Amino acid sequence: MATPLKDFNEHVIKVVNEVSRGVVTITTVKLGFESIFGTVPIRGLGSGFLIGENIIVTNAHVVSDARVVDVIFFDGSRFDGKVLIADTYRDVALVSVEDVPKGIKPLSLGDSDQLRVGEIVFAVGSPLGLPGPTVTMGVVSAVGRNIVGEDVALEDLIQTDAAINPGNSGGPLVNVDGMVVGMVTAIIPYAQGVGFAIPINTVKRVLEMIEAYGRPVRAMIGVYAASITPQVASAYRLPLKRGLLIVRVIPGTPAYEARIAPGDIITKIAGKEVSDVRELRRAVEDSIMQGYVELEIYRQGYGYRRVKVPIMVEEVG
């Protein structure tokens, strides 16, 4: 007798089978360290998934600096991979192969902005080098997590308790409809049930940048800003309790040319109120194809004004 649970179980089995066909294992060989026996190669392992005709997306840290990249599909077929793009700043890379097994289709990309905490997700990949895609189930534990360093900026990460192990990096995180909502990127060693995935919308933005510029780029307008908190508002005697306080403007940048100055307060971006500096960074990246970002600026003694600030781009690794 059919029950809602059995129906859901059958649906999950169908989704997982369809998704797994487009997931690959990626093995790499990189130059290693020097020894008395010569250079010792370093072998690496990761996952990836098909997003276009003979195009696979994975993490940049999986394939960066690799001398040899092998791509293995679910049926065991193996192809030489060529790294097309490796955006180490966002940890996204594209790898091409000459051919794919018959009948394999690119995975469908969802909308990670619609993810909700508690939503069921599946991580698909090749943990520990085990043959064939492995599937684990969990939920979205949190969204908006950040891992930021000097050469990397992983923002708005999806946190999940779906089991993630070494080798899962680059594999898809999919929802119950089989839509890719993220790409697995990191785990915290010794922490049970804490893994992270790059939102698929971030991957989409990288693809748009590559289509427009031929390479990954970093978007900016040339300001340093701080989120206004009650403490910041009190310390600087600010007239507003919400927004982004401009603390520095880089000379020669679009913001400088738009006459934005330290002490100004960004109150809205594209007509929406703003309170977190991460919203500015994201809005600038989201507007890269548009070429400008529209800001509402408040300056004490002068009131509010709206300004369209052009976006400048610089190449990233």
Language-model segments: which ranges?
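PDZ peptide-recognition modules
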Residues: V223, V249, G263, E273-V277, ...
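PDZ/PDZ-like domain micro-motif
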Residues: S169-G170, T229-R237, I250-K268
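PDZ domains, with a preference for the canonical peptide-binding region formed by the helix
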Residues: S64, Y256, K268-E296
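Conserved PDZ fold ligand-binding element
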Residues: L50, I56-V57, P254-V277
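Short, structured beta-strand/loop micro-motifs enriched in basic residues and often containing a Trp
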Residues: V100-P106, I246-I250, D276-V277
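Serine-dependent protease modules
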Residues: M1-Q231, K241-R242, E285, G301-Y304, ...
